[in-house]
Amino acid sequence: MIQQETRLKVADNSGAREVLTIKVLGGSGRKTANIGDVIVCTVKNATPGGVVKKGDVVKAVVVRTKSGVRRNDGSYIKFDENACVIIRDDKGPRGTRIFGPVARELREGNFMKIVSLAPEVL
């Protein structure tokens, strides 16, 4: 679960390497985000010449969490790291590539472009 002040790895080539969560979107008192939820972040570490710069405030969708998520068939899926993909307002990714696997739960959130760019969907 991702909450305020959580640092996440960025799993795309938008130029950001690491982001810090400012807010979890979706409700007035919402505290935590899981896979497929949108968060507001600030870029803490970025590569030179990227689309986003250090200090930029961006929206991102969570694609991997250490705590994992329970599926309807009773199985759980967990990852080794917390990771997100920086998105535009139309739910499309700001970068052109996605690194690492993403969870199938992104399909339910209509993040189809991220799912199609990902090398593996678990």
UniProtKB/Swiss-Prot annotation:
<comment type="subunit">
    <text>Part of the 50S ribosomal subunit. Forms a cluster with proteins L3 and L19. In the 70S ribosome, L14 and L19 interact and together make contacts with the 16S rRNA in bridges B5 and B8.</text>
</comment>
<dbReference type="Pfam" id="PF00238">
    <property type="entry name" value="Ribosomal_L14"/>
</dbReference>
<keyword id="KW-0699">rRNA-binding</keyword>
<keyword id="KW-0694">RNA-binding</keyword>
<protein>
    <recommendedName>
        <fullName>Large ribosomal subunit protein uL14</fullName>
    </recommendedName>
</protein>
<dbReference type="GO" id="GO:0022625">
    <property type="term" value="C:cytosolic large ribosomal subunit"/>
</dbReference>
<dbReference type="GO" id="GO:0006412">
    <property type="term" value="P:translation"/>
</dbReference>
<keyword id="KW-0687">Ribonucleoprotein</keyword>
<dbReference type="InterPro" id="IPR005745">
    <property type="entry name" value="Ribosomal_uL14_bac-type"/>
</dbReference>
<keyword id="KW-0689">Ribosomal protein</keyword>
<dbReference type="InterPro" id="IPR019972">
    <property type="entry name" value="Ribosomal_uL14_CS"/>
</dbReference>
<dbReference type="InterPro" id="IPR000218">
    <property type="entry name" value="Ribosomal_uL14"/>
</dbReference>
<dbReference type="GO" id="GO:0003735">
    <property type="term" value="F:structural constituent of ribosome"/>
</dbReference>
<comment type="similarity">
    <text>Belongs to the universal ribosomal protein uL14 family.</text>
</comment>
<comment type="function">
    <text>Binds to 23S rRNA. Forms part of two intersubunit bridges in the 70S ribosome.</text>
</comment>
<dbReference type="InterPro" id="IPR036853">
    <property type="entry name" value="Ribosomal_uL14_sf"/>
</dbReference>
<dbReference type="GO" id="GO:0070180">
    <property type="term" value="F:large ribosomal subunit rRNA binding"/>
</dbReference>
